[in-house]
Amino acid sequence: MAREYPLERYRNIGIMAHIDAGKTTTTERILYYTGKSYKIGEVHDGAATMDWMEQEQERGITITSAATTTFWTAEDATKDPMSDPETLREGQPKHRINIIDTPGHVDFTIEVERSLRVLDGAVAVFDGVAGVEPQSETVWRQADKYKVPRMCFINKLDRTGADFYYCVQSIIDRLGATPLVLYLPIGAESDLQGVVDLVNMRGIVWQAEDLGAKYEFVEIPADLADKAAEYREKLVETAVEQDDDAMEAYLETGEAPDAATLKRLIRKGTMDRAFVPVLCGSAFKNKGVQPLLDAVVDYMPSPLDVPAIKGVLPDTDTEETRPSSDDEPFSALAFKIMNDPFVGSLTFTRIYSGKLSKGQVLNSVKDKKEKIGRMLLMHSNNREDIDEAFAGDIVAIAGMKDTTTGDTLCDPANPIILERMEFPDPVIELSVEPKTKADQEKMGVALNRLAAEDPSFRVSTDHESGQTIIKGMGELHLDILVDRMKREFKVEANVGAPQVAYRESLAREVEVTYTHKKQSGGSGQFGEAKVVVTPGERGQGIIFEDEIKGGNIPREYIPSVEKGMREQAESGYLVGFPIIDFTIRLIDGKYHDVDSSTVAFEITGRGAMREAAERGGIKLLEPIMKVEVVTPEDYLGDVIGDLNSRRGQIQGTDSRGNAQAVEAFVPLANMFGYVNELRSFTQGRAQYTMQFSHYDEVPANVAQEVKEKLA
């Protein structure tokens, strides 16, 4: 089976947005117009094709990012833009679009992060009433981190209170981005009829009857002529800045470049992230989706337009790039694992170079071989078996044994490890206990499966109580995982109240000499270590420095000292939470020819850490959340008063449309159940988002309470 679509006709894009901006609906429409799903699934009917987990359909939010492959033919820019829509697409090459739908809820930013890692471009969807919302900012920053070229679709312009121009301004104010407006809305709110296409200077109007597949080109309405001319001029001026020759020609003649040249310039600026093209419409009312697809083909990068992926060679640690080409050695990144009710475990994989057929590949991170048996192309919830996949493809591989999220798959003869993804540490935890003996075994399997799928979800056992503790990014995150355990794995469990994931930290530098000796006939145990333990910067982790001179502790025992100290730090000192962010300097020690061993030095390390904690003093740290509440003016005082009562530090307020946004740092311990209280004192009119910001010291009186509660 040869490659069907050349690489330059691939588009790997993500659709990202704030919760409720209409992202899944937009994806649904894209699938409908590209002929992938024959009937439109509505989110509020619980029938959207991309949201295929039962809970997503019940809650109406997207939790997992499903990858879907679809196809589209764009217009021919050299033909008369007013000719019939069919004629404009005739004879044009088909493009293959892989869409990754991402969740917009802040508890699932991990999903967004891992999708952005494998995309080449992204479409940010905004709500036409609210403009840029907190989660949109988070996602935007994540996209900046991965240098993803993107464009914006201002959606829901059929809603009462929708304001396209306010949204464009909010892209400048809140994201610090440079919007390049390509379309203006015709009509507003319930009277939205279509859009003005500024590249071709024409109106596009949808005939409402048949789900928006039919539209026609019209002259630009007279009442929009001035506005269209003004925005067209801005568009041309920004576009010609991308190319010196075009700029010169424009300055000399004052004539705008033709449509084909304009598109080329806009494409260049989009890829260089000089600006973000802005489109508009209403996905729900089927208006503006075809121009969005055209823009994806015209302006979003193909795998050849983005820098080649970098990696390191496992043996030598030298850096190497793998260009997007079928002739390069095979390399791919496993970016998501899902359990499929029909196929079992599926590993979603982005192929960066080479081709993949059935047989063996190497997981270079784990250094294990994996067998490729069954490969699938996913169309939201139905699937197509394939025998071969190429550079640029996003495929699902069934039945992999050892591969987890973020692992590299490659050709065993040419191993490489691609850049890994970073996953945040969880900030909230709760205990789960199986209801019956039968549930006990199933629960272990279920939790391991869920943890393999989601790297921001961790499972551990409390050594003292024997309870199983699950940790995640927020209440909703853990809620959904417990719910999935019940539905998918039929495990009934009692769930404890959510607990804060506190941390411990050293109060001051301390020098400790610890000797472990056990003599009792025969071979004994002996180890001595002298260490200096110093509190570090927040977020530095544990740093171990070996400063042993002259072999006072033999080389082979030094890792044991480090291991013992790290393990002891993990189990904490004050109330059993990990001690974080400090530096250990191992400066001296002693050993015995017969009695010393790796085990003896590990015990020495543990003892040294215990003593360092005891003598250096321990402070309790708590996770501080960045909270943003958007509330009507009337409740502003109540909201601020309430946040203050939760030990919050107000950072500022600013007006957003007709509402006020309050930003504050609040300890997570004081935010449980906030959603219900906020709802009750604002009559459900305020909403909030929160995300982890940093760890900070717990005030003495609160620390005392925590100790008593947890002791």
Curated annotation (Swiss-Prot):
Coiled coil: none annotated. PROSITE patterns: G_TR_1, G_TR_2. The keyword Hydrolase does not apply. Signal peptide: none annotated. Keywords: Cytoplasm, Elongation factor, GTP-binding, Nucleotide-binding, Protein biosynthesis. The keyword Cytoplasm applies. GO terms for cellular component: cytoplasm. InterPro entries: EF-G-like_DII, EFG_II, EFG_III, EFG_III/V, EFG_IV, EFG_V, EFG_V-like, G_TR_CS. GO terms for molecular function: GTP binding; GTPase activity; translation elongation factor activity. SMART domains: EFG_C, EFG_IV. It is found in: Cytoplasm. GTP binds at residues 17-24, 101-105, 155-158. Its main location: cytoplasm. One of its GO terms (biological process) is ribosome disassembly. Residues 8-304 form the tr-type G domain. It holds the Pfam family EF-G_D2. PANTHER family: RIBOSOME-RELEASING FACTOR 2, MITOCHONDRIAL, TRANSLATION ELONGATION FACTOR G-RELATED. Catalyzes the GTP-dependent ribosomal translocation step during translation elongation. During this step, the ribosome changes from the pre-translocational (PRE) to the post-translocational (POST) state as the newly formed A-site-bound peptidyl-tRNA and P-site-bound deacylated tRNA move to the P and E sites, respectively. Catalyzes the coordinated movement of the two tRNA molecules, the mRNA and conformational changes in the ribosome. Belongs to the TRAFAC class translation factor GTPase superfamily. Classic translation factor GTPase family. EF-G/EF-2 subfamily. NCBIfam families: EF-G, PRK12740.1-5, small_GTP. This is Elongation factor G.
